[in-house]
Amino acid sequence: SGSCTTKTCWTTLPKFREIGYILKEKYNAAVQVEVVRASRLRQPTFLKIKQIKSYQKPMETDLVYIEKSPNYCEEDASTGSVGTQGRLCNRTSPNADGCDMMCCGRGYNTHQYTKVWQCNCKF
């Protein structure tokens, strides 16, 4: 009869925030590994879990690390990290922008400001 059907398929990426959340969860659950050199010729080098809590082999999608992360709270000139000291934080937030987390237990100072400006109001 001359009719034609077109089928179009596409894949979309999840929202950036969702990806960030998943990566943060994986980062928090990452396990430390150490490189084990082969003792004999033709034997491959492999990674071994450094601390055995309840041994569970990491899956291909899990994160592992060889060296511990630096202390992001403190300034580190070698990496260019400025740390968190002196940054503004949200006193009521339980997230990364919150003072409890961002200030790394050092405590924080609160300041109250009054802002005055012309509003061009007409009465």
From Swiss-Prot:
PTM comment for this protein?
A: Palmitoleoylation is required for efficient binding to frizzled receptors. Depalmitoleoylation leads to Wnt signaling pathway inhibition.
Q: What Pfam families does the record point to?
A: wnt (PF00110)
Disulfide-bond pairs as recorded: 89-104
Name the segments for region: Disordered linker: 33-61
UniProt KW keywords: Developmental protein, Disulfide bond, Extracellular matrix, Glycoprotein, Lipoprotein, Secreted, Wnt signaling pathway
Q: Which residues are glycosylated?
A: 90
Gene Ontology molecular functions:
cytokine activity; frizzled binding
Q: Where in the cell is it found?
A: Secreted, Extracellular space, Extracellular matrix; Secreted
Function description: Ligand for members of the frizzled family of seven transmembrane receptors that functions in the canonical Wnt/beta-catenin signaling pathway. Required for normal fusion of the chorion and the allantois during placenta development. Required for central nervous system (CNS) angiogenesis and blood-brain barrier regulation.
Please identify the protein, giving its name as recorded.
Protein Wnt-7b
In its UniProt entry, the species of origin is given as: Meleagris gallopavo
What gene makes this protein?
Answer: WNT7B
